[in-house]
C-alpha cells in the first residue's frame, strides 16, 4: 500500500511537468487509475502491507481510504469549469494541491503508527488552507482560512503532546500492538485521552468548537468544499476511533460531557439549518449535525457505535459532497447562493433535480439509504448508553428531515425566478459528477458487509 | 586600523557594491520580462487593485452607480451584507470627476414631465432628498445636506404650446405632483420682472421642484454606500469577457459576461475581476462599454439578431453660463424655462444667475473636449434672456462651464433594464440631461430588478432596452 502513496507523489510531479493541455487530463485520468490499487484493499481483513511496515488497513480505514481516493477525480471534474481562465502556474498548483491532499489523506488513513497519522493529519491542513484562501469566492475567505487553521492547530497541539506522552508510557505508538489500552487505573489518564481527542473533536466538528466549519465550507471553492465535507471531517472520526481504542475504557471517563454536547448539537444544528439563507451554509451546518451523531456513536465505546459511526461517515461523505456539487452547479450559472434567489429549479433543470431529490432524501436518512443504517445503529448504541438520549435523537431526526425537505423544496419548487433567461444546459460533465456520487451511494445499500 | 579600513574598502565598498548592483539589475530584468497581469505579481502590490471576484460590478462611479450600490446594500438585511453573495465593486476611472456628467450638471429637479414614469421617479427623488438625513446618515458623521432650494420650475408656453402644457399639467396633478397653472395675468402679478409677451400659460411647481448640489448628493451616496460595505476602486474597464455555451434553444448560444478587465491607472497592470452581475452606469461613455461585447455590431453568424441594436447613448456637450445682474429678478426667481428651450435660474444670494439652452441639432458643439463656446451665449442665449427679462439687458458674464449629457439619440429617455442577450448585464444609461433628478429612483429600481427579479415600487419596464428592438421609442415632450 505504500505504492498507493507513491502513486500520488508521482501524480503531483506529473501535474507539475506536463504541458498546458494535459494538466487536467493527467490529474483526472491518473486519479482514476489510482483507484485500481485501492481495490486490493477491499478484503476487510486487517492487512499489514508487504511493501512497507508503516501501512496497514482494516475495516475502519478501508472505507475512508476508498472514499478519499474516489473523491479526487470528482473534485477535479467539479472544478475544471471555474479554473479555465486562470493562468497555467495557478492551475498546476491547484491540481497539485488536491492530489497532494489526497495522498496525505491516504497516508493518514492507512498509517499503522499514530505519529505517522499525526504527520499526515497536519499535512492535510496546508493544501486545504491554500485552496480556501486563494480560490475561494468572497473576500471573507481570509477570515475563513484563519478560523480553519487556528481551530485545527490549537486542537492538535495537545494531540502531539499526548501522543508523545503515550509513547513515553507505552514505548510504542504502533497501532497493531496497542489494542489493549494503557493499563492505568487512576483518573488522570482521562486527561491524556481528552488531550488526544481534542484535535479530532475540532475536526469533526463537535458542536461547541464548530465555528470554523460554516465559514470554511462556504468560502471554499467547490473542490475545497467537497474534500472538506467529504473526507477531512472523517479524519476526526477515524482519529477518535484509533485513539480511544488505544487509551481504553478507563480513559474515557469524560466521554459523557462530549456526548451531551454532541446530542445537543444534533438538535441545535437542525434548528439552525432551517434558518439559513445561503445554500452552501445550509449544507455546511447539516454536516455538523451529522457528525455530531458520529461523535455520539464513537464515544459510546461499543462495537455497534463504531459500526454506525463508520457507515454514517461514508454515507455522509458521498451525500454532502454531492450536495455541494449541485449547489455549485447553480452558483456557476446564476452567481447567487441565496435560497430566495434560486427557486423553481425543477422547471429549469429537471434531470439534475433528480440528483437534488435523491441526495436530499439520503441526507434525511430515508431507507434504504445507508445513511439510515448508520444512524439507526449509532442511535441504538446511544440508547444503550442512556435511554433519555432518545429525546434528543428523535428531535434531531425530525429536524434533519425538516431541513432536508426545506432545502429541496425551496430550491426546486415554487415560482421560477424570472430574471434568469440565459442559463446554459447542464453539461454531461455535471451529470457524470452527480452519477459518480449516486452510484456508490446506491451500490452500498446492497453491500451490507460494510457494517456486519 | 589599516586592516579594518582595507576590509571595509574591499568587502563593503567593493564586493557588496558589485553584488548590489548586479542584484538590482537582475531584479529589473525580471520585472520587465514578466508580463504584468493577474498571473504574476510584479513585486509591487498595487493597493488599489480590486480582488478577483465580486458578485456585482458597477461600471462607472457617478451618481447612478453609487445610487445603485447604496440601494443594493440597503435592501439586504444588515447581518447578511457581504455574506449571501452581495459583494459590490464600483469601478470609476476618474475619482476627481473632471468630466463626469454628475458633478457638471446644474442639479435641478422637477416633476413637470409628460411620462408618468418620469414624474413618479422625480417625486420619489425629491422625497429622498428631503429625507436625506434618514437615508444617508453615517454614524458619527455630520448628517448629509444637499442644499436643496425648492424654488420651483416655471414652464412658459405660447399659444400653440398651451394645450400641450395643460395636458402635461393634468397628468402631473393626477400623479400627485404639486404644480399649478398660471394664466398670463397671474404670471404678471406673481413675477413682475418677467416679460409675458407671447406667453399664454405657465406651469409652476409649488413644492418638490428646484435645484440642489449634485456633488454633495454624490458624496453622500458614496459615503453611505462605503459605510454599508461597498468596495470601490480607481480603474478603467477595458474589456468584458464573455462565455458562450449551448443552451436550450437549438442553434443559439447562452452568453454571459464572466469577467471584467479592470486596468489600473497609469499602469499596464490589470485585474481580471470575475463578476456575477454587471451594471453599466458609465454615463456618456456607456456605448463604449456596450461595444466591448458586440452590442451594436453585425453578428457574423446572424444568430443573435438582438445584438444589432446598439446602445444609443452618446456624449453631447451642453454649456452653462453664470452671469451677474444687479437689478435682476431677485430671490423669487424660479427656474424659468422659455418656450424656445432657454432656461435661467437664480444662483446663490448675490444676484448671480445661471442659464443655458440645448442647442439645435445642426448647431451641436463638438463633444471631444469641454471648451466653452462663448459665442453661443452672445448670439443665441442673451437675446432670449433680454427678451424674457428686461433687467437682463445689462449683465456681466462671470463664468461658464461645459458638461456632457449622456444623450439617448433615439428618444432622450432613460434606458433601464437588462439586455435580451446578456442577462447579467443591467443598464442604467441615456438619461439625456434629467439623470441627476432620477438617480435615487433609478438606483432603487435597478436594485429591485437585480435582487427581486422585477420592479417592485415603480414599474419602469417601458424604459427597457427592448423598445429599441421593437422600434417603439418613448417620447418625452418636456425636454429641457
Swiss-Prot record, chain A:
GO terms for biological process: ATP synthesis coupled electron transport; electron transport coupled proton transport. It is an enzyme of class 7 (translocase). Its EC number is 7.1.1.2. It is found in: Mitochondrion membrane. Disulfide bonds: none annotated. GO terms for cellular component: mitochondrial membrane. The chain crosses the membrane at residues 4-24, 29-49, 59-79, 88-110, 114-136, 144-164, 182-202, 221-241, 252-272, 282-304, 309-331, 345-365, 390-410, 432-452. Its main location: mitochondrion. It catalyses: a ubiquinone + NADH + 5 H(+)(in) = a ubiquinol + NAD(+) + 4 H(+)(out). It is a multi-pass membrane protein. The keyword Phosphoprotein does not apply. It holds the Pfam family Proton_antipo_M. Keywords: Electron transport, Membrane, Mitochondrion, NAD, Respiratory chain, Translocase, Transmembrane, Transmembrane helix, Transport, Ubiquinone. InterPro entries: NADH4_N, NADH_UbQ_OxRdtase, ND/Mrp_TM. The keyword Endoplasmic reticulum does not apply. Core subunit of the mitochondrial membrane respiratory chain NADH dehydrogenase (Complex I) that is believed to belong to the minimal assembly required for catalysis. Complex I functions in the transfer of electrons from NADH to the respiratory chain. The immediate electron acceptor for the enzyme is believed to be ubiquinone. Belongs to the complex I subunit 4 family. This is NADH-ubiquinone oxidoreductase chain 4. It comes from Branchiostoma lanceolatum (Common lancelet).
Amino acid at each position: 500500500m505504500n505504492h498507493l502513496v507513491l502513486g500520488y507523489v508521482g501524480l503531483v510531479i506529473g501535474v507539475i511537468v506536463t504541458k498546458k493541455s494535459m494538466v487536467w487530463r493527467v490529474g483526472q485520468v491518473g486519479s482514476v487509475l489510482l483507484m485500481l490499487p485501492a481495490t486490493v484493499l477491499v478484503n476487510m481483513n486487517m492487512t499489514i502491507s508487504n511493501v512497507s511496515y508503516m501501512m496497514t488497513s482494516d475495516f475502519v480505514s478501508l472505507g475512508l481510504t476508498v472514499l478519499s481516493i474516489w473523491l479526487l477525480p470528482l473534485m477535479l471534474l467539479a472544478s475544471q469549469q471555474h479554473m479555465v481562465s486562470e493562468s497555467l502556474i495557478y492551475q498546476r498548483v491547484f491540481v497539485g494541491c488536491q492530489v497532494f491532499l489526497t495522498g496525505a489523506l491516504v497516508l493518514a488513513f492507512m498509517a499503522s503508527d499514530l505519529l505517522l497519522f499525526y504527520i499526515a493529519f497536519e499535512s492535510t491542513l496546508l493544501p486545504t488552507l491554500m485552496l480556501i484562501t486563494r480560490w475561494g469566492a468572497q473576500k471573507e475567505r481570509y477570515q475563513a482560512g484563519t478560523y480553519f487553521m487556528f481551530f485545527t492547530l490549537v486542537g492538535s497541539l495537545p494531540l502531539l503532546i499526548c501522543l508523545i506522552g503515550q509513547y513515553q508510557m507505552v514505548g510504542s505508538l504502533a497501532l497493531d500492538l496497542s489494542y489493549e489500552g494503557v493499563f492505568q487505573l487512576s483518573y488522570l489518564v482521562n486527561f491524556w485521552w481528552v488531550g488526544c481527542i481534542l484535535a479530532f473533536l475540532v475536526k469533526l466538528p463537535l458542536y461547541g468548537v464548530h465555528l470554523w466549519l460554516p465559514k470554511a465550507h462556504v468560502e471554499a471553492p467547490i473542490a475545497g468544499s467537497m474534500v472538506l465535507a467529504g473526507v477531512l471531517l472523517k479524519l476526526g472520526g477515524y482519529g477518535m476511533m484509533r485513539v480511544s481504542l488505544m487509551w481504553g475504557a478507563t480513559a474515557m471517563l469524560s466521554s459523557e460531557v462530549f456526548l451531551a454536547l454532541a446530542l445537543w448539537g444534533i438538535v441545535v444544528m437542525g434548528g439552525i439549518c432551517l434558518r439559513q439563507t445561503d445554500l452552501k451554509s445550509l449544507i455546511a451546518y447539516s454536516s455538523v449535525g451529522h457528525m455530531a451523531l458520529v461523535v455520539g456513536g464513537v464515544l459510546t465505546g461499543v462495537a455497534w457505535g463504531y459500526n454506525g459511526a463508520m457507515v454514517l461517515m461514508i454515507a455522509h461523505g458521498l451525500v454532502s459532497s454531492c450536495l455541494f456539487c449541485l449547489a455549485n452547479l447553480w452558483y456557476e450559472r446564476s452567481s447567487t447562493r441565496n435560497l430566495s434567489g434560486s427557486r423553481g429549479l425543477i422547471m429549469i433543470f429537471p434531470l439534475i433535480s433528480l440528483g437534488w431529490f435523491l441526495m436530499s432524501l439520503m441526507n434525511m436518512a430515508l431507507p434504504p439509504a445507508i445513511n439510515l443504517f448508520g444512524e439507526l445503529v449509532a442511535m441504538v448504541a446511544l440508547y444503550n448508553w442512556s435511554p433519555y438520549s432518545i429525546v434528543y435523537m428523535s428531535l434531531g431526526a425530525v429536524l434533519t428531515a425538516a431541513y432536508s425537505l426545506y432545502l429541496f423544496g425551496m430550491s426546486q419548487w415554487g415560482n421560477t425566478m424570472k430574471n434568469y433567461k440565459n442559463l446554459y444546459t447542464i453539461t454531461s460533465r455535471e451529470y457524470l459528477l452527480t452519477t459518480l456520487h449516486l452510484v456508490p451511494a446506491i451500490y452500498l445499500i446492497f453491500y451490507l458487509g460494510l457494517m456486519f | 586600523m589599516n586592516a579594518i579600513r582595507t576590509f571595509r574598502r574591499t568587502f563593503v565598498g567593493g564586493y557588496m557594491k558589485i553584488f548590489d548592483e548586479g542584484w538590482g539589475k537582475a531584479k529589473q530584468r525580471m520585472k520587465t520580462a514578466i508580463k504584468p497581469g493577474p498571473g504574476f505579481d510584479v513585486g509591487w502590490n498595487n493597493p488599489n487593485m480590486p480582488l478577483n471576484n465580486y458578485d456585482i460590478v458597477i461600471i462607472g462611479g457617478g451618481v447612478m452607480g453609487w445610487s445603485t450600490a447604496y440601494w443594493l446594500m440597503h435592501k439586504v438585511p444588515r447581518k447578511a451584507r457581504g455574506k449571501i453573495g452581495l459583494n459590490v465593486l464600483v469601478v470609476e476611472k476618474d475619482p476627481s470627476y473632471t468630466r463626469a456628467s454628475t458633478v457638471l450638471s446644474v442639479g435641478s429637479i422637477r416633476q413637470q414631465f409628460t411620462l408618468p414614469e418620469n414624474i413618479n421617479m422625480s417625486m420619489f427623488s425629491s422625497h429622498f432628498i428631503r429625507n436625506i438625513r434618514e437615508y444617508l446618515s453615517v454614524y458619527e458623521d455630520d448628517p448629509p445636506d444637499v442644499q436643496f432650494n425648492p424654488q420651483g420650475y416655471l414652464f412658459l408656453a405660447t399659444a400653440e404650446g398651451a394645450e400641450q402644457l395643460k395636458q402635461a399639467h393634468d397628468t402631473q396633478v393626477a400623479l400627485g405632483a404639486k404644480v399649478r397653472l398660471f394664466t398670463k395675468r397671474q404670471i404678471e402679478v406673481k413675477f413682475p420682472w418677467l416679460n409675458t409677451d407671447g406667453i399664454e400659460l405657465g406651469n409652476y411647481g409649488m413644492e418638490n421642484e428646484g435645484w440642489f448640489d449634485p456633488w454633495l448628493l454624490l458624496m453622500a451616496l458614496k459615503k453611505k454606500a462605503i459605510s454599508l460595505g461597498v468596495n470601490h476602486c480607481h480603474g478603467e474597464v477595458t474589456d468584458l469577457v464573455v462565455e458562450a455555451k449551448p443552451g436550450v434553444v437549438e442553434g443559439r448560444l447562452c452568453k454571459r459576461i464572466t469577467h471584467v478587465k479592470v486596468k489600473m491607472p497609469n499602469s499596464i497592470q490589470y485585474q481580471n475581476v470575475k463578476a456575477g452581475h454587471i451594471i453599466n452606469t458609465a454615463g456618456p461613455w456607456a456605448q463604449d462599454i456596450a461595444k466591448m461585447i458586440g452590442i451594436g455590431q453585425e453578428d457574423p453568424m446572424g444568430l443573435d439578431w438582438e445584438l444589432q441594436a446598439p446602445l444609443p447613448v452618446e456624449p453631447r456637450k451642453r454649456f452653462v453660463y453664470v452671469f451677474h445682474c444687479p437689478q435682476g429678478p431677485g430671490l423669487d426667481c424660479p427656474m424659468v424655462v422659455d418656450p424656445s428651450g432657454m432656461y435661467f435660474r437664480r444662483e446663490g444670494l448675490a444676484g448671480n444667475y445661471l442659464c443655458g439652452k440645448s442647442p439645435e441639432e445642426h448647431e451641436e458643439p463638438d463633444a471631444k473636449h469641454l471648451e466653452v463656446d462663448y459665442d453661443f451665449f452672445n448670439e443665441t442665449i442673451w437675446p432670449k434672456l433680454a427678451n424674457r427679462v428686461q433687467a437682463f439687458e445689462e449683465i456681466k458674464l462671470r463664468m461658464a462651464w461645459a458638461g456632457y449629457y449622456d444623450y439617448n439619440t433615439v428618444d432622450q429617455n432613460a434606458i433601464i433594464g437588462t439586455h435580451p442577450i446578456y442577462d447579467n448585464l443591467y443598464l442604467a444609461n441615456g438619461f439625456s440631461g434629467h439623470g441627476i433628478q432620477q438617480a435615487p429612483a433609478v438606483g432603487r429600481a435597478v436594485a429591485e430588478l437585480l435582487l427581486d427579479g422585477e420592479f417592485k415600487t415603480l414599474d419602469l419596464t417601458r424604459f427597457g432596452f427592448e423598445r429599441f428592438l421593437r422600434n417603439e421609442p418613448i417620447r418625452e415632450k418636456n425636454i429641457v
